[in-house]
């Protein structure tokens, strides 16, 4: 770099931002002839004015969203001094405005791939609203600069150099980012007061950065534009015809006074160094226009320096603030640009899989964009399902949440009453027909029931999740991850018992903390074990026998082991098994059992976790057994916490699918409702509530009847999340009401008794108490209850009217008949209207009990309020376990009542709504990771069995088309 050029850079960097400093000494732009006729257009003054305007805009943004700051990143490869000067100027201007500007300096050795990766990281960073790549690239290896500028997201290309933004400008779409120097030129022309429309404009120079975009901007400002360049003939004649002359040819003082039309506006974009012995620096800055001559002819003229240069930086800042404003606008935008899928209901209504196959789902990436997700927040699993990154919660942390609706049911028949179908009909009605931002949030179904008797759980008829095969089978593998994590813990538990029984303390300790390359070191999880034991030493070689013995030996009591292996199929022969029968296990065997995967405590942990850190802590806290002194043994004690978290890391991200009408559906976690809390994940609901925004709706469901799933949704899930539901939808059917009125048993696979296919008002009247108890259950939590009567073809209008009248008299907010199974969202519009009105009532939600109550008192509160029981009675074994859990510090946890789903009582054969009965609690255990104490009311199996004729008989794969057949 020449000494003359270095002096030029110093002069350039010192060029003042304050207009008051211009006009004396070294800063004078030809002061001797400043008194002549042309008006000087001060870019410095205009840029200062723009910066002040931008500073006010940034201040307003921070008031609109607390702590919001526009972000600019300036990427530089190498360390060219001229680039450093320009970067410092940009950062100085940004800081003055209130923009968070950072210099991302990368080494000369960087490769094109590495540079593209860095730019992609910035593209995906929500804190960054503008990115510029400083040119030229000062690199050791060849890098395609055009590819680099096009790698910057068009939405963050504040230099305006991306091909997309250039193309938008070329066709007159000025909604993209405009190149900074040409935009600055246009602003200077406008501020001169000269009318652009109809004027003759000549642009001298055709560079990508200045000449070409300047010509386009003038053209779309309605000037008549001619572009000239080094090959243009009669150049002087053409420029002399211009009312507006923009010069960026790169030749010092090329344009003479004779080239300029008298009174013309002349914008000089050039900057050159010219020797000048009269200057202390030995040189001066000049433009592409002979300034002295132009002053005599032009009407308006920009100086060099102090003309276009400051405007380039100012317009860069303006683009950055503009980008940040668009980000804020998208964040605050209330209405999704959702393209719904039309339904064409057929009569008679076809099977679920035929309906699902007839509807072509939209690409899941399209749906994700429609609902406001950024590409970096979505991991695609093919074209129809995706995972959503938890980073979306950080991006939307300040966004107001929508209305929260829980769909529950009356005590169901073995056939189910259509909660999921009603939920899907409701969200299709809200999203596709009422045009409200609406998200369904569902549990992922277990494969066990899918291949057993119940079938799938995607909804039914014209109110479904699609593709239903993906939904009902593997989806994205979350349940498999839960199974793997659960069984890893089970394997470590039995293995630890084996090793402790076959080794003495010292040998056990030496194997747990081995010397690696001559050095022994505790792992982080072992340090936590030491801390739990009150041992402060960190050097393994310093522990005494009294210290390393308790550290190495968990001393698990096999009779207290609560942890079971799992598999996600119905297998009755795994309900009781013996493990450790191989001779290699040296006679250390025990009786245990398998549960179905969704019954694992890890599934409940997944559903109740609020973050990765929260999940990891919950996994650590899981109690697998008690030691021989009665102290709890945890997953952390077994050293397995980190490994479990690794297996479950991706499973914590909710899955995105869609309804038959193209509205979004979140599918995540699937704990059973009779043995766990029976709700989808807190994280899925939270993501949904943020995405739908203030006026939107997230509709989720709670398993089985309100006495089971909804009670746990409120007392466990909402207590954990801190969210308060705005309304409860109570799903009922005439069929279920008749059953509770004394109707014949409803048996899967068997024809319905004619009591259910003919009008029978007497049975309906007798069965209403069951429905009314469920209405009371919702009211006990302060929620407005909307009864949705899921219409069946055998129902009669008189039966419907009887149910609606009774529901309203019992205090339901509304009672409507819904036909979503046959009609899709259109059949649930009345339900949607009722839900909207219910959510406008104001939130009066309250919990049922305080955690400080003793465990048995909490059980009694649930049983008497939710079930109508007189009291709970604990078996001696349950009483002993309550005492043990209370002594161990678990007395302040919420209660998860595990009981049959087909009755308010502990006996599934007792229907209706009995009062004052005794509820027997046979067993009590803690799910410390999930954060609740389970009370077992009677025998509830955690491993279903296959029926005589399971659904597998009808399920097949068409090897010609690859389609799955027979799912329902």
UniProtKB/Swiss-Prot annotation:
EC number(s) of the enzyme? 1.5.1.5, 3.5.4.9, 6.3.4.3
The coiled-coil segments of this chain are none
Task: Extract the SUPFAM superfamilies matched here.
Answer: Aminoacid dehydrogenase-like, N-terminal domain (SSF53223), NAD(P)-binding Rossmann-fold domains (SSF51735), P-loop containing nucleoside triphosphate hydrolases (SSF52540)
Keyword Hydrolase belongs to the record: yes
Q: Where is this region: Methylenetetrahydrofolate dehydrogenase and cyclohydrolase?
A: 1-338
Q: Which Pfam families match?
A: FTHFS, THF_DHG_CYH, THF_DHG_CYH_C
Q: Which residues bind ATP?
A: 413-420
Pathway(s) served: One-carbon metabolism; tetrahydrofolate interconversion
Any Gene Ontology CC annotation: cytosol
Q: Name one GO molecular function term.
A: methylenetetrahydrofolate dehydrogenase (NADP+) activity
**Stretches the record annotates as Formyltetrahydrofolate synthetase:** 339-968
Provide one Gene Ontology biological process annotation. Answer: amino acid biosynthetic process
| UniProt keyword list | Amino-acid biosynthesis, ATP-binding, Cytoplasm, Histidine biosynthesis, Hydrolase, Ligase, Methionine biosynthesis, Multifunctional enzyme, NADP, Nucleotide-binding, One-carbon metabolism, Oxidoreductase, Purine biosynthesis
State where substrate binds.
Answer: 86-90, 133-135, 305-309
Its subcellular locations are: Cytoplasm
Q: Which reaction does it catalyse?
A: (6R)-5,10-methylene-5,6,7,8-tetrahydrofolate + NADP(+) = (6R)-5,10-methenyltetrahydrofolate + NADPH; (6R)-5,10-methenyltetrahydrofolate + H2O = (6R)-10-formyltetrahydrofolate + H(+); (6S)-5,6,7,8-tetrahydrofolate + formate + ATP = (6R)-10-formyltetrahydrofolate + ADP + phosphate
Q: Where does NADP(+) bind?
A: 205-207, 230
Q: How does it assemble?
A: Homodimer.
Recorded domain comment: This trifunctional enzyme consists of two major domains: a N-terminal part, containing the methylene-THF dehydrogenase and the methenyl-THF cyclohydrolase activities and a larger formyl-THF synthetase domain.
Q: Which family does it belong to?
A: In the N-terminal section; belongs to the tetrahydrofolate dehydrogenase/cyclohydrolase family.
Protein name per its UniProtKB record: C-1-tetrahydrofolate synthase, cytoplasmic
- Whichever gene encodes this chain, its name is pug
């Amino acid at each position: 770099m020449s000494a003359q050029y270095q002096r030029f850079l110093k002069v350039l960097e010192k060029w003042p931002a304050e207009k008051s400093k211009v006009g004396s000494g070294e800063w004078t732009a030809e002061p001797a002839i400043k008194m002549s006729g042309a008006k000087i257009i001060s870019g410095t003054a205009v840029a200062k004015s723009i910066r002040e305007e931008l500073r006010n805009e940034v201040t307003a943004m921070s008031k609109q969203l607390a702590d919001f700051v526009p972000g600019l990143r300036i990427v530089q490869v190498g360390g060219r001094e001229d680039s450093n000067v320009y970067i410092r100027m940009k950062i100085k201007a940004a800081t003055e405005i209130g923009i968070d500007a950072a210099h991302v300096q990368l080494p000369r050795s960087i490769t094109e791939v590495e540079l593209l990766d860095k730019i992609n990281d910035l593209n995906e960073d929500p804190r960054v609203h503008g990115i510029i790549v400083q040119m030229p690239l000062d690199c050791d290896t060849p890098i395609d600069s055009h590819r680099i500028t096009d790698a910057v997201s068009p939405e963050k290309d504040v230099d305006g150099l991306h091909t997309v933004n250039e193309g938008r400008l070329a066709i007159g779409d000025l909604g993209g980012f405009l190149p900074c120097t040409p935009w600055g030129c246009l602003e200077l022309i406008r501020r001169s007061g000269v009318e652009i429309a109809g004027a003759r404009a000549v642009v001298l120079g055709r560079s990508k950065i200045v000449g070409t975009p300047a010509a386009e901007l003038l053209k779309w400002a309605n000037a008549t534009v001619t572009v000239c360049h080094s090959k243009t003939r009669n150049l002087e004649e053409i420029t002399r015809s211009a009312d507006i002359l923009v010069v960026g040819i790169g030749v010092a003082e090329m344009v003479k006074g004779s080239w300029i039309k008298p009174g013309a506006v002349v914008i000089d974009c050039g900057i050159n160094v010219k020797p000048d012995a009269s200057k202390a620096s030995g040189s001066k800055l000049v433009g592409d226009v002979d300034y002295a001559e132009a002053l005599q002819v032009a009407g308006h003229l920009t100086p060099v320096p102090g003309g276009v240069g400051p405007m380039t930086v100012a317009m860069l800042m303006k683009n950055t603030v503009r980008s940040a404003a668009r980000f804020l606008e998208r964040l605050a935008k209330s209405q999704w640009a959702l393209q719904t899928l039309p339904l064409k209901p057929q009569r008679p209504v076809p099977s679920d899989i035929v309906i699902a196959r007839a509807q072509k789902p939209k690409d899941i990436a399209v749906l994700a964009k429609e609902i406001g997700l950024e590409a970096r927040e979505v991991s695609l699993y093919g074209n129809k399902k995706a995972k959503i990154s938890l980073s979306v919660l950080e991006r939307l942390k300040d966004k107001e949440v929508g209305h929260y609706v829980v769909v529950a049911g009356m005590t169901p028949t073995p056939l189910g009453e259509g909660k999921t179908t009603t939920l899907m009909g409701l969200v299709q009605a809200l999203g596709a027909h009422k045009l409200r931002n609406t998200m369904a949030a569902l549990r992922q179904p277990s494969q066990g029931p899918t291949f057993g008797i119940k079938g799938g759980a995607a909804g039914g008829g014209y109110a479904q999740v699609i593709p239903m095969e993906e939904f009902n089978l593997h989806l994205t593998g979350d349940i498999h991850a839960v199974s793997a994590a659960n069984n890893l813990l089970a394997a470590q538990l039995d293995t630890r018992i084996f090793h402790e029984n076959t080794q003495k303390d010292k040998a056990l300790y030496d194997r747990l903390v081995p010397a690696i390359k001559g050095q022994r070191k505790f792992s982080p999880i072992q340090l936590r074990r030491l801390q739990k034991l009150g041992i402060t030493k960190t050097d393994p070689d310093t522990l005494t026998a009294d210290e390393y013995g308790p550290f190495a030996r968990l001393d698990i009591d096999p009779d207290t082991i609560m942890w079971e292996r799992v598999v996600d199929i119905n297998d009755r022969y795994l309900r009781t098994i013996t493990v450790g029968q191989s001779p290699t296990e040296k006679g250390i065997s025990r009786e245990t059992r398998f549960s179905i995967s969704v019954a694992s405590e890890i599934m409940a942990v997944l559903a109740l976790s609020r973050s990765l850190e929260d999940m990891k802590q919950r996994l650590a806290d899981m109690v697998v057994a008690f030691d021989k002194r009665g102290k709890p043994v945890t997953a952390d004690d077994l050293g397995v916490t980190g490994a479990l978290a690794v297996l479950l890391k991706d499973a914590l991200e909710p899955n995105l699918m869609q309804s038959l009408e193209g509205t979004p559906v979140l599918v995540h976690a699937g704990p059973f409702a009779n043995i766990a809390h029976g709700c989808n994940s807190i994280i899925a609901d939270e993501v949904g509530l943020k995405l739908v925004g203030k006026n939107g709706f997230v509709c989720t469901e709670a398993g089985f009847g309100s006495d089971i799933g909804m009670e746990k949704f409120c007392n466990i899930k909402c207590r954990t999340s801190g969210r308060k539901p705005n309304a409860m939808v109570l799903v009922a059917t005439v069929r279920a009401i008749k059953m509770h009125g004394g109707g014949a048993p409803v048996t899967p696979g068997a024809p319905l008794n004619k009591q259910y296919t003919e009008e029978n008002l007497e049975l309906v009247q007798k069965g209403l108490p069951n429905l009314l108890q469920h209405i009371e259950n919702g009211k006990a939590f302060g929620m407005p209850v909307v009864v949705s009567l899921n219409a069946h073809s055998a129902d009669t209008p008189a039966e419907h009217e009887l149910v609606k009248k009774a529901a309203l008299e019992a205090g339901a907010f509304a009672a409507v008949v819904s036909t979503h199974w046959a009609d899709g969202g259109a059949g649930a519009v009345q339900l949607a209207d009722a839900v909207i009105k219910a959510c406008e009532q104001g939130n009066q939600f309250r919990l049922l009990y305080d955690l400080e109550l003793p465990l048995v008192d909490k059980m009694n509160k649930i049983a008497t309020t939710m079930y109508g029981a007189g009291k709970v009675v604990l078996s001696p074994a349950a009483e002993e376990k309550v005492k043990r859990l209370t002594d161990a510090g678990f007395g302040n946890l919420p209660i998860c009542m595990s009981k049959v789903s087909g009755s308010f009582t502990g006996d599934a054969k007792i229907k209706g709504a009995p009062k004052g009965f005794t509820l027997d609690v046979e067993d009590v255990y803690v799910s410390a990771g999930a954060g609740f104490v389970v009370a077992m009311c009677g025998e509830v199996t955690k491993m279903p069995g296959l029926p005589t004729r399971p659904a597998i008989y009808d399920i097949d794969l068409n090897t010609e088309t690859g389609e799955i057949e027979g799912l329902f």
